[in-house]
């Protein structure tokens, strides 16, 4: 039997085939991407949209950035994969480049963000037994309520999302949790609340090997902690010989107006950093764990690995993606445009008659919160559908929050178009038919 792929599908056929043949583990907005450039996306019929999601901050450098694509094309004709059974020159170059770029001593290459998280959990446990001398099988890793670190078992063991991430997936990993050790089943470490960490450390500090935290919680709805939270948390971790792991997979690579989001916190440098998404500019799956040589050396040959991690194609693409961040001053651009966008959104909030209850974020990682009572019972999903009709694409997180995170290369003019589309959509929101999402 010869099978032939149908290419160049229409929007309708794309949605039909996806519904019929793929797993139903996502509920996408009814729009189809066919091509993209910078902050602009086109569907198969040629309709143009502004992208205000950036593939969950994976395309910070803009869709199909020519410098990154050229690196991909050049390397693809030379060597794409060696596995780590052998060395390849691109990974060696990437290792030196990425550690110097972010100011760490050692890198572990992986592919997806979830793999980076799992790798860090393994590394932290191994460090806990080898260096901190925690008794066998007793090491604890703590998360925080509202966290999102992926959907693997390690990540959902940390999660507090009982409806989506955890339902019908138990039992979860022992001692990998957002619960306060020794507390009741419904006592979680509250994000940003240093006293909850103190309570956990005072009772179980000798068994805790690591704390993993997002500098800003993304999937929770762009939740920004107080400015010195990470500084205080790291000080507490050092006091109890606990590793601080910062998940920068969504917040890193210039997204928040700093190269890495933790840099907003004074006198803070996490022990382990996790990167993914925009480290490849959205071109290939690339992720990594960055740490000190002392911590990373807890991994020995055979203790961890990945066939594709550190492959030459991904390594070359990641170098090019970080070069774009550097050469195009995307950190400064994100800070400047982020302030511009948030100022415009605050103006819109004041015009919204209470429909927008809050604007929050840092840099170009922003969110608006919808008050359903003022919106006649309509949700963020309803607003996103209206925005789509106005040519702007965003996605809700939870029922009443919309994350707004356009590519960092977006122009002020397009940012204003995006805000105007929200304004028009808000005027229609109270009377639009309710969706059944």
From Swiss-Prot:
Q: Write the Enzyme Commission number(s) for this entry.
A: 2.6.1.13
Keyword entries, A-Z? Aminotransferase, Pyridoxal phosphate, Transferase
Tell me what this protein is called: Ornithine aminotransferase
UniProt record similarity statement: Belongs to the class-III pyridoxal-phosphate-dependent aminotransferase family.
The protein's required cofactor(s) are namely: pyridoxal 5'-phosphate
The UniProt record lists the keyword Cell inner membrane = no
Q: In which pathway does it act?
A: Amino-acid biosynthesis; L-proline biosynthesis; L-glutamate 5-semialdehyde from L-ornithine: step 1/1
User: In the record, what terms sit under GO molecular function?
Assistant: identical protein binding; ornithine aminotransferase activity; pyridoxal phosphate binding
How is this protein annotated for GO cellular component? Answer: cytoplasm
Name of encoding gene = CAR2
Which species is this record about? Kluyveromyces lactis (strain ATCC 8585 / CBS 2359 / DSM 70799 / NBRC 1267 / NRRL Y-1140 / WM37)
One annotated GO biological process: L-proline biosynthetic process
Question: What is catalysed by this protein?
Answer: a 2-oxocarboxylate + L-ornithine = L-glutamate 5-semialdehyde + an L-alpha-amino acid
Which InterPro entries does the record match to this protein?
A: Aminotrans_3, Aminotrans_3_PPA_site, Class-III_PLP-dep_AT, Orn_aminotrans, PyrdxlP-dep_Trfase, PyrdxlP-dep_Trfase_major, PyrdxlP-dep_Trfase_small
**Entry-linked NCBIfam families:** Orn_aminotrans
């Amino acid at each position: 039997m010869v099978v032939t792929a149908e290419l160049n599908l229409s929007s309708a056929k794309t949605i039909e085939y996806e519904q019929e043949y793929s797993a139903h583990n996502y509920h996408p907005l009814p729009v189809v991407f066919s091509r993209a450039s910078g902050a602009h996306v086109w569907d198969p019929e040629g309709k143009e949209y502004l992208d205000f999601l950036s593939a969950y901050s994976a395309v910070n450098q803009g869709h199909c950035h020519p410098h990154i694509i050229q690196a991909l094309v050049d390397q693809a004709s030379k060597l794409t994969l060696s596995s780590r059974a052998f060395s390849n020159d691109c990974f060696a170059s990437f290792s030196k480049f990425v550690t110097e770029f972010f100011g760490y001593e050692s890198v572990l290459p992986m592919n997806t963000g979830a793999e980076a998280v799992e790798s860090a959990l393994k590394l932290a446990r191994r460090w806990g037994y080898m260096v901190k001398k925690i008794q066998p099988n007793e090491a604890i890793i703590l998360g925080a309520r509202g966290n999102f670190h992926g959907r693997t078992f390690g990540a959902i063991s940390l999660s507090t999302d009982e409806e989506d991430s955890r339902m019908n997936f138990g039992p979860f990993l022992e001692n990998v949790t957002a619960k306060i050790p020794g507390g009741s089943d419904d006592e979680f470490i509250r994000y940003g609340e240093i006293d909850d960490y103190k309570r956990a450390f005072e009772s179980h500090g000798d068994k805790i090997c690591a704390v993993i935290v997002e500098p800003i919680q993304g999937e929770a709805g762009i939740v920004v902690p107080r400015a010195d939270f990470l500084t205080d948390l790291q000080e507490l971790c050092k006091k109890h010989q606990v590793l601080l792991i910062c998940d920068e997979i969504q917040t890193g690579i210039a997204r928040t107006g700093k190269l890495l989001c933790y840099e907003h916190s004074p006198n803070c440098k996490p022990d382990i950093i996790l990167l993914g998404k925009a480290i490849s500019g959205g071109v290939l799956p690339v992720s990594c764990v960055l740490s000190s040589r002392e911590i990373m050396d807890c991994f020995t040959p055979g203790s961890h690995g990945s066939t594709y991690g550190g492959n030459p194609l991904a390594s070359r693409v990641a170098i090019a993606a970080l070069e774009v961040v550097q050469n195009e001053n995307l950190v400064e651009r994100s800070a400047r445009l982020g302030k511009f966008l948030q100022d415009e959104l605050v103006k819109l909030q004041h015009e919204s008659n209470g429909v927008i209850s809050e604007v929050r974020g840092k840099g170009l990682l922003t969110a608006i919160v919808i008050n359903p009572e003022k919106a006649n019972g309509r949700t963020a999903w309803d607003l996103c559908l209206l925005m789509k009709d106005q040519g702007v694409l965003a996605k809700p997180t939870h029922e009443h929050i919309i994350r707004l995170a356009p590519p960092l290369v977006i122009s002020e003019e397009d940012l204003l178009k995006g805000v105007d589309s929200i304004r028009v959509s808000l005027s229609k929101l109270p009377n639009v038919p309710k969706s059944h999402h």
